[in-house]
């Protein structure tokens, strides 16, 4: 760094050529931007270890150790990158939007279209799933729709999905809602006055005449703490944190609208899909997820229903974010919406908290060119 600054000073003092000075400044700036781009993209590339080449979720959900090992590797790299606080302003989180059936260039590979409510659940590697609903034609929001239990899923941690108590926004899937009778047990207020129902078993037994309302659960009773953990219980896989949006109804309860309760859009680096990226052209919001200036016209999914131009959109979105253009964080849910010919395209978001601050391009250039161009910082 000192040698580079000495070279710039030498050009200013002895060359007397403004063209040479500008050329050298441009070369130094290009080098700084390229180095910063490598720093920022490294954690996202390590997400490929977590999300690459698997149908619709994290590796290791079958009880293996690959997910935990990959998480440790990603955390290790993030901590290494976060140690050097070069500038005060920067990014504390790096978020990668998963476009429908897309490859985020070399960051997240082999995104699969996957809907467990369809039979068949989709063709891996394609932009949209094929299949038809089973029993319930109105999609996953149809009341009392029985979820399909995954095979060899790990058990729920004691205390629910969130340590220290139930999930925010409602009960965990598989648990009874407040005011409803528990599966296989009496009502919250105790048994009905007068004892058990005539001609039927006592409270706590099966309902007379067959299974209780809501339909049977494949494989037996509904999931309970210590039982199978369904994919709908991972809101950060399905849709990621959704800022300022209420919870959405899912089978057995309500998923929280946000995982940790806070998102700071200014400190999140977004990499999104679409022909211009979900954040719009160069991350400015123009022609973004919600169309031309938010009107819905020329929106990303309508321009690119099959994800063909998603890598181009990722490039423009990354380039815009690199220079400080950033739109508010916008997360697209997996299920529903107007994405794809069947409306069931796989989209979402993954966020990596680097545990520190990765310096921004503006801060790097301000430190590099100060005091010559200190106004950049």
UniProtKB/Swiss-Prot annotation:
The keyword Signal applies. It is found in: Secreted. GO terms for biological process: mating plug formation; sexual reproduction. Residues 155-253 are annotated as: Disordered. Disulfide bonds: none annotated. The gene is Ebp. It comes from the Eukaryota. Residues 165-228 have a biased composition (Pro residues). Major protein component of the posterior mating plug. Accessory gland proteins constitute, or are required for formation of the anterior mating plug. Posterior mating plug forms before sperm transfer and the anterior mating plug is formed after the start of mating. One of its GO terms (cellular component) is extracellular space. Keywords: Behavior, Secreted, Signal. Specifically expressed in the ejaculatory bulb and seminal fluid. Detected in mated females 3 minutes after the start of mating, and for at least 3 hours after the start of mating. This is Ejaculatory bulb-specific protein 1. It comes from Drosophila melanogaster. Residues 1-20 form the signal peptide.
